[in-house]
Amino acid sequence: MSIEWKARFAGVPLIHWLAVIFVIGLGLFPITLALVRLWAVTGITPLEALISVNEQPGAMDAFRFSLFEATVSTGLTVVIGLPLAWAFGRYQWRNIRLKRALLFLPFVTPPVVAAVGFLALISPGGVLYNIGFDLRSESGVVGWLAAKTGWEHPGHFIALVTAHVWFNLSLMIRFVEPVVAQVNPVWEEQLALLPSGQTRLGRIQHLWRPVLGPATLVAATYTFFFSFTSFALVKWLAPSSNTMESLLGEIGGTAGIPGYRTETSLAVLAIATFQMLLMLVMLILAGRFERRHSQVLSMHHETMNRERHGPASRRWVLFVNGILVLLLAPLATVVLSSFRVRTVNGAGVSSDWTLEGWRRAWNGDFSTTPLLEALTNSLSYAFVSLLVALPLGYAVASSLVTLRQRGHQRAAGVLDSLCMLPLSMSAVMVGLGMVAGILQWFPQMFSFPYLPAVPHIMLVLPFVIRLMVPAIERIDPVYGEQASLLPMGKVGFWWHTRGAFLVVPATMAASLCLAFSMGEFGATFLVVRVGSWDSLSILVDQVASRPKFDPYVFPTAMALATILMVVTLLVLSINESARAWRSRHDV
Amino acid sequence: MRCFCFVMLLLFTAPLSGCLETLEPITADEEGQCAVLDAGRTSDGVLRILTYDIAAFSDEMISTFTNQTGYDVEMIRVDDSGGILEQLLQTQQAQQADLAIGLDNTYLQTALNFCLLQPHELNLTGLSETALEPYDGPNAVPFDRGDVCLNYDESRVDGTNLTEPTSLWNLTEPAWEGQTVFPSPVTSSPGRAFMSATVDYFENDEDNTTDAFDWWKAMAENGAIFTSGWTEAYEIHYSGGYGAWVEGHLGDAALTVSYCHSPGVEAFYGENWTQSTSLTLERSTFHQVEYAGIINGGTELEAANAFIAYLLSEEVNRNMPENNLMQSVLDNATWPETNGYAYHTDSPSLNAEITNERIAEEMEGWISDWKTATQ
């Protein structure tokens, strides 16, 4: 063992190394097992399967559709999100915390709730339908567009892309707004004195493009990633189309069974390998952009910058507030729909106000899991995910920061990418890993009551690490040097040099963990097939998917969705309280 | 760095060295006999039922069973009948449930071939002969039934725009272009049942030069819509059903696959009003029976037997049409008269005659042919 080898480990405690290995293993193991299992069942290697991906029914259509809708979704998100983030970061705003929370809300809204909200908005009786924009049955303008262009289901496509933009706008805010808010005003002043800074185009070209470019690209990469792997929104809003993710979800249940539907196992192997490689490329790109992005942050004090530019003009106020109203529309529709019932008889259609949906949701009249049990399950999985993911995420982030500070940039980069792997696999792939992988070889896990928390942990860990790394990097090492001179124990030393500075980011990570786990759909959708662990998001989907001969089925589903939304919002409010606390104490 | 990568590689590939050995499924021997497997979990007094979203299993119904017998019940829910079979196959080496409820006769034989069920200990009486026709062995007990058939929208098939088909070939005519929707037999139980019926239908028609898959090909070429499940077909695409009043409805198809009693159910909830009716062409309908079976490798066997007995009791099974929207399997079962439920329910004159054994043997081939025909 070389001295260099020892030095690389010297700065990182052994327990943190174990956490790093555990996290990487947690991400790699299920999917590797799943791939090997599918290999064993089909007798075809992942590479051979990959070559045959174009022969799998629906695979290429799904690939083309995923690519197209993700590209359009990303483009639109940037077009709308960039000016939004710029205005939001540059000027003073009333109730900025509330506005920021509302802008962030869609990202943590469970996709299944968002999907039913959009459905209610675009169906007959919905706001969009009433103003003549029929995206569902594609009559009127949308029907004309379909007839003129020969484009099949443009309405469904528009609805899906709109939902993706709605979902991902907060990413632009999350990544771009802080850069705008903290950009050093001296740069702008100096540029204004130069010939190239005299025109708007010149300022964009010489200041805003290099400053905002990396952050925008990071947000765009993640938007593309989330749109490409969209599952619940596609299932509900574009029923005639499949993304690769929804196709995998559709056929994944039959994969990995020896002697049964081997061709399905082959299709899953081929599509899963193809998608994983694609996402891996996306992940490497995102990592590269993010590293560039992190060098631009923390340039100037945000409050001073905002005071300098003053309140936003009326035009910007209208734009930002308008977007806020649009963002809330699908969620408001969910709540309203829970109180409306449509009935039909020989006399025609009528629509009445009712509390029956809420009564049934509460009493659990349907054969599904009772509401309180599903809510308890959801909260249990969320808290288990939090209890495991937070310390693990901290340990990994701490290791990565230490490695970077000691000059091991490359090693930190590789480990960082490996820890982000679950993000590249997407929820359905993780679920597939659980079903076709671990459960096939370790069936004892069937009786593990918190099984759905395992894929949740895998999926939230990358987010926790992403939040913790910059927070730890910001801590001045001088505190450590000073504390080492004082008489205090190990715990006290850790708290005064690190723990106290991480309370707020840890609270934010915790809230994200809880909200993400509460709304997670894809992985649970697959895991739930092998156990009795229905979460609230699954319950919403189950009830909404039931035959609606009985007109109260839909209001019941909407009532359940409202409960899920409110609980998620409560969790999110904790997040915003933490931000507020940080602003007051400025640690 | 290279050293680290090597260690990581070893760490993650070493445990997989034994994984490439294929796990062989447990199947019946040459005489069709199956060994009874060891219990997959430790007994905890809770009866675990593997089922799909069966409406009849309300909290009230389960509570009554618990009060009557003392057995606690926990439901493990999957998507549909096919999901039950997949779950049983995936967990064959360590079953976690005791009782499977909802396998239908298009899946049952596969479950029997893979030794997924074991004999019950009940003395069954009072079951209708029709319900026992597809299977009357000891490994599964019918608990509800219904006839899968085509449904059409009477307001569109009015004799002017579209006329009532007298042969399945009529649906391949230009007038029907883009007007039909079918749930896929790959992922839908009614879709699978209807595809099986078409095999029998075209084997017994007058034309010996074409088979079912020629018809499916012609249907695909005539713009038939294919969906993954019954719900998407009936609720989103079919214009004659309740979907017309549900968010997300498209209503682009005048004909779909459902049950012969679906118009009756529509009327039951629509105050004796429906614009949907069924098409009962001979051999184009499929008598679907759903079964309860004790899982081979289950733990709470006594409780499982007790639940089957409860499921077949007069108080539960007689109410299947209202509670589960399916027909009871008891002798002299009738559809309720309420709101025209019985009036709008048609009885097929001749269902497709196709055995469970043949379905199990040939289904994968049919599905493959169906995929080729409809691509």
Please annotate each region the language model reported:
Chain B
Residues 197-279:
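Ligand-binding pocket segment of bilobal, Venus flytrap-like solute-binding proteins
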Residues 26-110, 235:
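Early extracytoplasmic/lumenal segment of secretory-pathway proteins
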Residues 290-354:
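Mature extracytoplasmic/periplasmic domains
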Residues 38, 95-100, 118-155, 169, ...:
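A structural signal for short loop-to-beta-strand junctions that line the ligand-binding cleft
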Residues 105-116, 133-165, 185, 191-201, ...:
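Periplasmic solute-binding protein
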